[in-house]
Amino acid sequence: MRRCGIYVYPHRERDILCVKIWTIHLGSWGNPMPNRACVQKVLPVTKQISSDGSVQIDTVRAVLPEFQFPSHPQIGDCLSWIETFFSRSLVGFYDQGYTPGEESCTNSTIKGMSGKPTSIISNIYTTTGPAKVSNDYAVRDPGVAVDHFDQYGPLKEGRSLNSAKISTQWSGSATLKSSNRSIFNIGLGYINTFLGVSNVRGFSTGSGRSKNVLNKLDDLSKRSKNYPNLVIDRNLYKDFLLNRDMFLIAYNKLKSNPGMMTHGLKPDTLDGMSIDVIDKIIQSLKSEEFNFTPGRRILIDKASGGKRPLTIGSPRDKLVQEILRIVLEAIYEPLFNTASHGFRPGRSCHSALRSIFTNFKGCTWWIEGDIKACFDSIPHDKLIALLSSKIKDQRFIQLIRKALNAGYLTENRYKYDIVGTPQGSIVSPILANIYLHQLDEFIENLKSEFDYKGPIARKRTSESRHLHYLMAKAKRENADSKTIRKIAIEMRNVPNKIHGIQSNKLMYVRYADDWIVAVNGSYTQTKEILAKITCFCSSIGLTVSPTKTKITNSYTDKILFLGTNISHSKNVTFSRHFGILQRNSGFILLSAPMDRIAKKLRETGLMLNHKGRSVIRWLPLDVRQIIGLANSIIRGYDNYYSFVHNRGRFATYVYFIIKDCVLRTLAHKLSLGTRMKVIKKFGPDLSIYDYNSRDENNKPKLITQLFKPSWKVNVWGFKSDKVKLNIRTLYASHLSMANLENLQCAACQSTYKVEMHHVRQMKNLKPIKGTLDYLMAKANRKQIPLCRSCHMKLHANKLTLNEDKKV
């Protein structure tokens, strides 16, 4: 909402001075459009003030554009008590007309409830100054207060303004209007010099709460991008942690995550979430009494062996963590290095592998790096100090510290660590990226020091010059094709140019705590670079894993990164450029690791001795569900390895193993005996048809069939592209006020204390007509609104939607 001010000008001649300044002059992002909507709110007050007699106006709230007095406080959510006001006044708006009147009041004080001291009305106004660059979302539509005129009477066209006392602090356009409808369009910067007026001072009428939270996030991101070295001095805690809209965004982003139905130490989940619950969290945050509950620590298996600790926190605590993550992402995402790809919007494993495929050609020595227990070894004090160097709001910083120090329960004992960001926490990945950004900058500096490009022009070898001479001579003498072909083959096997000074190149990519440094240089130089990186990591409290970090020659061995084998091609290919045959060497190969895929299929019980197995856990499922699960496995592999060079072999292997698995499972389930009988029943593609409905060709409608991936190689088949960070694009779909506000109970249509009922998965529903599950399945939703009474009845299995159906 944009605000405009109205000035009550006291004058015995019943004249009016209305000065208007466009907000484009107040700040670089001010909205130039004035707000006319508030006129409807002001006119009733105007008529009351303009009437004869004494009038008292109570509790004018400055958040709404109702009325603007001199000395009105700048803080938007402050209440001002206007007891009485001396004046004989006229009130009006430009292009809106005015109603003359005369009234008498008693002069008193204006008290601000925002903590500012009580002050007598004077010529110094508190709502002055333009919108700051550091607070660009404070859209201001100001008026200009004119103290009084002297005995010379009302303003006339062409008359000097020496008698008027106007005060301002900036240059802007203004419109002066008097009773004879004479209008002066002037710039306030020229009033002193051109018209001879002094003490011109402007005031604005709001603190900027009119813009919604997405605009504030977007402005925060733009400021971080445009001024990367400036400290964020905004009140992040108040603007975002005490904002209901932010909780709605966080809730809508998390509500469909199955992990939100997994409880921590307490049995709380997102089930039963309502506006009242959010308001209670906000109140505890406002009083700074909010504390994160300790998590539940479990151990999960690691792919490389061993166990990885996972901390499961309270889902309601995760709402606050999600808000912290969103704000930190808006601040730091524009600052992150392009080499970082983990846990970032628009980036993924595919974007990291694409960067390697396009930029790492020619690098011989590769450092496969890994930070030992990265998430569990980040020092809290150093992390907090790093955040404090960028963010000034200490309440926001202390809330992050509370999240880090929440602790966990293991072996019936509470433990609190002074290092590590707990894995399983929503805010943990962004904090790890912020901390590892130091490593990104360090390696970027190493790259700028190491990179060197040798001379471009190099001489041909004597053998190459001799063969070129023989080729030209053979063509000149019209030699037979066999002789020319023989010379051409020799030319391809001989170095063309003399090797000059070697060009040095260092390339770097990181995904979370896994990173690759590729060096086009000597092995000795590569070892020196690894030693420098190891030393730097030690200085910031991290350890480079000696067992997982190694140096590999990409022309002789393969590098495993993000589940993909990386190597240089040993085959020499040729291509024509402008009719000239050129040799292509050192092509980067990205291939699917067939041995790891086979191992994974064996561990999950889908394969034995390179043959499919009947899956016992699938037997209770329907045929359609079995084929659907098989399709999800095939599509998962197909989507991740969409770019590999060995796609034909990979896709064929996975497809026939999973198909064999489905055939054996269906033969077991349907007691058909052999796989051939299953093929006769469902066809070679294992298709299921609905014979009760027909398509346009009068054929049975296809319900599902086994997915068959394409064998075609597409080396550019990466699923991620460069995405410009846009806060509105990221979160606009999650800002739906209807999700938790103005809800109606689906069972009894009550609007009192309505909250959301959640289910973990849609497949857990039993959509019997007349039940609540039927309503949820019909709407294809995992959440449905229920009032508190119906929600408690549902969990007690006593809720009825009609007289004969129970949930």
UniProtKB/Swiss-Prot annotation:
UniProt cross-references to PANTHER family, sorted A to Z: NUCLEAR INTRON MATURASE 1, MITOCHONDRIAL-RELATED (PTHR34047), PROTEIN YKFC (PTHR34047:SF8)
Keyword line: Mitochondrion
GO cellular component, one term: mitochondrial chromosome
Signal peptide start and end residues: none
UniProt cross-references to Pfam families, sorted A to Z: AI2M-like_HNH (PF21368), Intron_maturas2 (PF01348), RVT_1 (PF00078)
One record GO biological process: mitochondrial mRNA processing
Domain Reverse transcriptase: 281-566
Domain of life of the organism encoding this protein: Eukaryota
GO molecular function terms attached to this record: DNA binding; endonuclease activity
Subcellular location: Mitochondrion
Name of this chain's protein: Uncharacterized 91 kDa protein in cob intron
Misc note: This protein is coded in the group-II intron of cob.
